[in-house]
């Protein structure tokens, strides 16, 4: 690009005449038009007085960090007792463990993303996939987009979250009621439905290097039979052991 800048040169006679005439017109307009107008006197009105807002007595609520620490520590304790928490394995390792498993087999591992604590790895009809588990306000939920997040259920710990979806998937698979044929979808929604991956949580994949104890297996069996453990005629020590892991998985 070439930038052209006009240099200094003598003005022609016609240009000088035009500039002088324009200057005279501007001065004439200034003398006749640009005159200050008299301002009429108006009675002064008192400025309105506004009452200062009273400070609100309720201080903004701040979360106690100790509450988050207790919630996360309790979740880690439950996961270690579960037998299907695989710790700090990578996504590739989780894929290898789930590749030959039936659909619905899952495990929980540490997330490699710095903003998340845990990740759910599950075998789907298209192969193993991973879903991050989000933590906020002492609650855990499956990670989702911004629009779907208000409809995602939140739970006080990860094992409660997993057990909820396992129970719902098991109930759906055992249901024998025929479903009506779905209505045809628009082209855009049909493409989204085809691209979507359906998750089924049916059975956890236990660690091969950690065989569950007979006590833990009995505890699972009792939890599957009743949710009112405190009413069972058991010794206090055994009742406390059952309360340490009140889940069915």
UniProtKB/Swiss-Prot annotation:
Domain SH2: 84-165
Domain-level remarks: The SOCS box domain mediates the interaction with the Elongin BC complex, an adapter module in different E3 ubiquitin ligase complexes.
Record keyword DNA-binding present: no
SUPFAM superfamilies (alphabetical): SH2 domain (SSF55550), SOCS box-like (SSF158235)
Record's keyword terms, sorted: Growth regulation, SH2 domain, Signal transduction inhibitor, Ubl conjugation pathway
GO process annotations (BP): cytokine-mediated signaling pathway; intracellular signal transduction; negative regulation of receptor signaling pathway via JAK-STAT; protein ubiquitination
Superkingdom, natural source: Eukaryota
UniProt protein name: Cytokine-inducible SH2-containing protein
Protein's pathway: Protein modification; protein ubiquitination
Pfam families tied to this protein: SH2, SOCS_box
Function according to Swiss-Prot or TrEMBL: SOCS family proteins form part of a classical negative feedback system that regulates cytokine signal transduction. CIS is involved in the negative regulation of cytokines that signal through the JAK-STAT5 pathway such as erythropoietin, prolactin and interleukin 3 (IL3) receptor. Inhibits STAT5 trans-activation by suppressing its tyrosine phosphorylation. May be a substrate-recognition component of a SCF-like ECS (Elongin BC-CUL2/5-SOCS-box protein) E3 ubiquitin-protein ligase complex which mediates the ubiquitination and subsequent proteasomal degradation of target proteins.
Transmembrane segments: none
GO molecular function: cytokine receptor binding
Segments of this protein annotated with the region Disordered: 41-64
Domain SOCS box: 200-248
């Amino acid at each position: 690009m070439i930038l052209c800048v006009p240099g200094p040169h003598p003005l022609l006679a016609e240009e000088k005449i035009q500039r002088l005439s324009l200057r005279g017109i501007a001065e004439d307009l200034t003398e006749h038009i640009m005159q200050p107008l008299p301002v009429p006197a108006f009675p002064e009105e008192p400025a309105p007085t506004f009452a200062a807002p009273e400070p609100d007595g309720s201080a903004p609520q701040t979360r106690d960090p100790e509450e988050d620490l207790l919630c996360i520590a309790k979740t880690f304790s439950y996961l270690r007792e579960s037998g299907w928490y695989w710790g700090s394995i990578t996504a590739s390792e989780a894929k290898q463990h789930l590749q030959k498993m039936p659909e619905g087999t899952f495990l929980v591992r540490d997330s490699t993303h710095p903003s998340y604590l845990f990740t759910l790895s599950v075998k789907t009809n298209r192969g193993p996939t991973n879903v991050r588990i989000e933590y906020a306000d002492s609650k855990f939920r499956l990670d989702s987009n911004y629009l779907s997040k208000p409809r995602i259920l939140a739970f006080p710990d990860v094992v409660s979250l997993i057990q909820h979806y396992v129970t719902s998937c098991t109930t759906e698979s055992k249901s024998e009621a025929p479903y009506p044929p779905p209505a045809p979808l628009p082209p855009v929604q049909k493409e989204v439905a085809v691209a979507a991956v359906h998750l089924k949580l049916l059975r956890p994949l236990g660690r091969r290097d950690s065989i569950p104890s007979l006590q833990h297996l009995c505890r699972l069996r009792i939890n599957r039979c009743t949710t009112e453990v405190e009413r069972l005629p058991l010794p206090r020590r055994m009742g406390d052991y059952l309360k340490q892991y009140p889940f069915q998985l």
